[in-house]
Amino acid sequence: MSLPVVRLVWLGRVHYSELLALQEHWLRRLQADPRPGTLSGTKAGVLLVCEPAGPVYTGGLRGGLTPEETTRLRALGAEVRATGRGGLATFHGPGQLLCHPVLDLRLLGLRLRTHVAALEACAVRLCELRGLQGARARPPPYTGVWLGERKICAIGVRCGRHITSHGLALNCSTDLTWFEHIVPCGLVGTGVTSLSEALQRLVTVDEVMPSFLVAFKETFKCTLISEDSPS
């Protein structure tokens, strides 16, 4: 039996707004097709991957940022955006691998809960491939992947009509001081870390990408195909 096919779109370093616009484009395409899988042959959706070009704080469905917080964060030179994903406030920026899978869960045999678990397993597997054996997922409200008491990968998703959006953010060489201006994901008393900090050397998004794609294919049990046009 052939594996579901997911289209891979590597955007490189782009502004967060460009990622959201492309995500919305693919959401409309997949949700408009009443028969799963017929839009693009056997494709189960698209995997949008990028490195954010600038600092941006985002709020989720469980809570955003107050007007006062928004003003303060923008004064730091960061963009502030409300999103439709689950979770609370977090940070995205250069040195971070940002992955938004826009997938038809029916074609992957997944439900929302198992989709989130697969994203966590993908990040854990990536850490293992990079030589970090202690990464683990934790139950809500600690959704994501952790090294000890520090989160290395944040996860927040949305799902409507079986189609997912948003996804995971893995800190590779992220400037972690940006997280000091918020309570990441609303979790008081916890910290954040990165692959660079854990491995004590510079680990770039470009270096991590091959391991990430291996981990994604393993955990989602799919085939990835790369195409030139993102749309």
Swiss-Prot record:
Enzyme class: transferase
Pathway of action: Protein modification; protein lipoylation via endogenous pathway; protein N(6)-(lipoyl)lysine from octanoyl-[acyl-carrier-protein]: step 1/2
Main subcellular localisation: mitochondrion
Any GO BP: positive regulation of oxygen metabolic process
Enzyme Commission number(s) from the entry: 2.3.1.181
Signal peptide region: none
Binding site for substrate: 85-92, 154-156, 167-169
Residues carrying N6-succinyllysine: 43
Residues annotated as catalytic: 185
GO cellular component, one term: mitochondrion
Catalysed reaction equations from the record: octanoyl-[ACP] + L-lysyl-[protein] = N(6)-octanoyl-L-lysyl-[protein] + holo-[ACP] + H(+)
Location(s) in or outside the cell: Mitochondrion
Superkingdom of origin: Eukaryota
SUPFAM superfamilies, A to Z: Class II aaRS and biotin synthetases (SSF55681)
Alphabetical UniProt keywords: Acyltransferase, Ligase, Mitochondrion, Transferase, Transit peptide
PROSITE patterns: BPL_LPL_CATALYTIC
Function: Catalyzes the transfer of endogenously produced octanoic acid from octanoyl-acyl-carrier-protein onto the lipoyl domains of lipoate-dependent enzymes such as the protein H of the glycine cleavage system (GCSH). Lipoyl-ACP can also act as a substrate although octanoyl-ACP is likely to be the physiological substrate.
Additional information: In the reaction, the free carboxyl group of octanoic acid is attached via an amide linkage to the epsilon-amino group of a specific lysine residue of lipoyl domains of lipoate-dependent enzymes.
Family in the record: Belongs to the LipB family.
NCBIfam families given in the database record: lipB (TIGR00214)
Protein name: Octanoyl-[acyl-carrier-protein]:protein N-octanoyltransferase LIPT2, mitochondrial
Gene source species: Mus musculus
Gene (UniProt): Lipt2
